[in-house]
């Protein structure tokens, strides 16, 4: 028996073929655990997809991760992306969506945001591997002579590198590694990944691996039927690559019945209890409970020979809190990429998390930055309770963002700026309060007389675009008694960054004399990391991306305070409106 005292659980010896985890166990066996821990082989779950992309494999994998964690297991997650880009850092937001930044500076797929929010673990750049990064490593090894003159081929060299990336996460402090394979079975670029995970079974043992395949069960309107044929063809394609799925997760608009499950079971050679239905849900945080009711985690534990009790209580409490969040609040998101809302996925989820905390249902009003002038003209901006100005790159839409920041400042509308949002709020203040009419960022105007935002010194000679920004977690020292300091309630905080430009500190004294507070700086005081206004309910911004650290049960402090201020503004507006109505009614009677 291997005791894991520090986790409060026990795990059985690999020779017994079963991992057994029990809560609340203590005893004098810490040394035995340390001596024999290396014998325990972490379990692996591979999640593939078929029929169509964007089926929600990432949410399925994330929900499974949460369910396994609630069984006391130590879980980590990974995304394998078949595209040839080295990472998504230079990809167009309209094509890829959000770039999720990890603490160690990895620019990764947005699914890692789902992973972190669901399993409540900080992941690293190792949790995202692309075809581009894998080929880059293989070619670098060839140039070094690591292959000793052999012909470099997809099999074994590329597949070996893929397996190395998977195995890299299987450390001593992990019980289960969940790996999502991006793309769709049948795509030509996914073939090396399928071959690698097929081979992986023979290397770690059948009892240590589980294949989960996600498919679509579409509803055909004219016939009024749910169709299983796409699932059958997808599984046939997967089996032709040497992989027999242990479980099939069927995405559908409406629940599927036992009759369809029996049909899929018979056609795809999977036990009926291993055919899992993932129908559409009202909110994504319900999904772990629904998948548990379908038996997803139970059947995976059976495949992997894991015996671990489940405690769903905390997650049920979270979902109950989500369902009870009904107080309306309208937040305007002033963005450059609002046509693809996934470009702001973590911002959206962070706003929702803050809403859960306050019992509020956040309505996000999507506003294209270039359209702000028209919205101001017809007063639609006045219906907002709060504003978020998120990050982005390039000059398009900047003047609209600046006008939104001005509107929020002048009308006392709570406003939170993120990364580029902090920069445009700085420019707005310089122009309209300090009188620097042509103030700008040198990203947008190299000839400005007042470069209140300028490129960082160590970025001036950088020419490559990929992976060269100020990336990852950096510390900031907060000013006590400020809105930011009070929100965090910590003197020093760590946030994730992704930028090349910064507040130009040569202007700092002029800003501060006018009530503009630099409420957080880098430990060496060289970089301004947080700003706020002294005489405003909430006009706050950060050079960081705090949205990457919010959790559904622990909203980020800045988003929490934004929603709190927005609710207060809404309550005041409604109270004022009622008072005006009563006064008008009294005047009419008199």
PLM regions and their residue ranges:
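Cysteine-nucleophile active-site neighborhood
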Residues: 58, 62-66, 380-475, 480-483, ...
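Extracellular ligand-binding/catalytic regions of CAZymes and related secreted enzymes
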Residues: 553-590
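Active-site beta-strand termini and strand-to-loop segments that position acidic
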Residues: 531-536
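Glycine-rich phosphate/pyrophosphate-binding beta-alpha loops
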Residues: 500, 544-551
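Intrinsic low-complexity, disordered N-terminal segments enriched in polar/charged/small residues
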Residues: 2-4
